[in-house]
Amino acid sequence: MGELPQSIRESIKNDIKNCEFLGFKDAAHLHQKEPFSVGIYRNQNKEMLVTCITEMPEVSPRMIDWWFGWHLNESERYQLWHPKAHISASLKEDNSHFETDKEKYLNMDSYVSEYIGNELNNLCISFVEPKQFGFSDLNDEKETAICAHVRDMSNNISVASITHLVSRNAEGSRMQSSFWLGMNPTHTNSILTSLIKPLLESRLAKNILITDDLARNLLIHCAEEMNHLVKFLPILFKDKTN
């Protein structure tokens, strides 16, 4: 997969920072208004924020939109992204009839199996409109925001919210990624949510479920897959869209 960037290696070694941070509904402010850096943060509620930056020379925001629409429904495509950690990917509905790249992933549920660290995870990644994360005025020519909520399929409980903001620069693009862990624990069954939410939101539960190792492994995983994507996406995009 190649060597991790220096900023990632340093963040993995550093202590996790105890501080308050904005939630996923304010992702636009976090990404666009404040200095954004690589790191792992824990707030007083024991929720965690993992942030990653990927420099993407020769990659455009449009390529990222295309990639997310293209890879969702075939495991072989998903495995290109992280050959060591990605196992399978599927959709329960066909997205091939949609015309635009964004339509092919927005409001879709992607079912994936992947390793984060040494643990195999079966997840449902539900892609949503960027407006849900506070991105109301994106310039489609210069930027795109991939936003999603993640559910653990072993218990049907939401475990994370994600955004990848991709912005044009002189070399290509820069991707800013954020993962919020434990901030919105819900079950697909609303009755069960009302019963278990107080437990899931307790500091004790979050201390057990949201570990330092999980956060560090997630940062490594994101850095590996995004830096690997940079290596082949420009050529793949040109080949498939020409």
Regions found by a protein language model. Give the residues of each.
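A short, structured loop/turn motif at beta-sheet edges
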Residues: E58, F135-E141, L165-R174
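Terminal "cap-and-tail" regions of soluble proteins that handle hydrophobic small molecules
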Residues: M1-Q44, S167-N242
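Hydrophobic/aromatic beta-strand elements that line small-molecule binding cavities or substrate pockets
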Residues: T54, Q132-F133, S161-R168, F179-W180
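Hydrophobic residues positioned within well-ordered beta-strands of beta-sheet architectures
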Residues: V50-C52, I146, I162, M175-S177
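Hydrophobic ligand-binding cavity/cleft-lining segments
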Residues: S7-K102
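Glycine-rich portal/gate segments that line the openings of hydrophobic small-molecule binding cavities
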Residues: H86-I157
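Coil-to-beta-strand transition motifs
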Residues: N45-L49, P61, N156-V159, R168-R174
